[in-house]
Amino acid sequence: MNEFKKYATRHIGLNAQALDDYTRIQSSYISPTIIEERQLNVAQMDVFSRLMMDRIIFLGTQIDDYTANVIQAQLLYLDSADPGKDISIYLNSPGGSVYAGYGIYDTMQYIGCDVATICTGMAASMASVLLVAGTKGKRFALPHSRVMIHQPLGGMQGQASDLEIAAREILRVKKELYTIISSHSGKPVEQVEKDSDRDYWMTAPEALEYGMIDKILEKNRK
């Protein structure tokens, strides 16, 4: 984790405060520490850091700027460390900020590594976009997972001209999101738009049929 922190702050320019805030978010979970015996010493680390050593990123929170910054840094670091090896993102998230999610999405598409996505509970709203954006053939869900797509939410107060600007932007975002889901799932944009008019919940088999995932994982055979 120390190597990642050095990379994130020195080479990517990620604010150290953002890393600390993300650590506090993670510590709000029951986050056990791992004692790992090595050849010369014994190392203690939180379980999320240990997972990252195996190229596993866990997104188990609402998507906000702090979370997105760290996940983008993790993706870039792992791509730099070994460009030919897959990265896995486990998703259990209700979604969150579209703009923060865009940062994660674009980074997933930018890096050279294949990115496997695995839904382990719920991938809703922006998290469903990240799920479907995984590398084709490497998008998975556990049997009782739920996937939900819907139109973006927004609201603001201000002058009439400001409201018009905000309305145009949310319509542009809606079109972008539907296009992304369509391009990765194979569903026509018109179908995605119709289904997303209200919360559209899918079971794992329904998500498979829709093209959001490629396979339902029953058992880890490793």
Swiss-Prot record:
Reactions catalysed, semicolon-separated, are: Hydrolysis of proteins to small peptides in the presence of ATP and magnesium. alpha-casein is the usual test substrate. In the absence of ATP, only oligopeptides shorter than five residues are hydrolyzed (such as succinyl-Leu-Tyr-|-NHMec, and Leu-Tyr-Leu-|-Tyr-Trp, in which cleavage of the -Tyr-|-Leu- and -Tyr-|-Trp bonds also occurs)
Which keywords appear in this protein's UniProt record, sorted alphabetically? Cytoplasm, Hydrolase, Protease, Serine protease
Q: Matching Pfam families, A to Z?
A: CLP_protease
Q: Which gene encodes it?
A: clpP
- Main role? Cleaves peptides in various proteins in a process that requires ATP hydrolysis. Has a chymotrypsin-like activity. Plays a major role in the degradation of misfolded proteins.
* GO MF annotation list: ATP-dependent peptidase activity; ATPase binding; serine-type endopeptidase activity
Put simply, this protein is called ATP-dependent Clp protease proteolytic subunit
Localization per Swiss-Prot or TrEMBL: Cytoplasm
- Which family, according to the similarity comment? Belongs to the peptidase S14 family.
List the PROSITE patterns hit by this protein, alphabetically. Answer: CLP_PROTEASE_HIS
InterPro entries under this entry? ClpP, ClpP/crotonase-like_dom_sf, ClpP/TepA, ClpP_His_AS
Its subunit composition reads:
Fourteen ClpP subunits assemble into 2 heptameric rings which stack back to back to give a disk-like structure with a central cavity, resembling the structure of eukaryotic proteasomes.
Q: What is its EC number?
A: 3.4.21.92
- Output the GO biological process annotations, alphabetical, semicolon-separated: protein quality control for misfolded or incompletely synthesized proteins
Q: What class of enzyme is it?
A: hydrolase
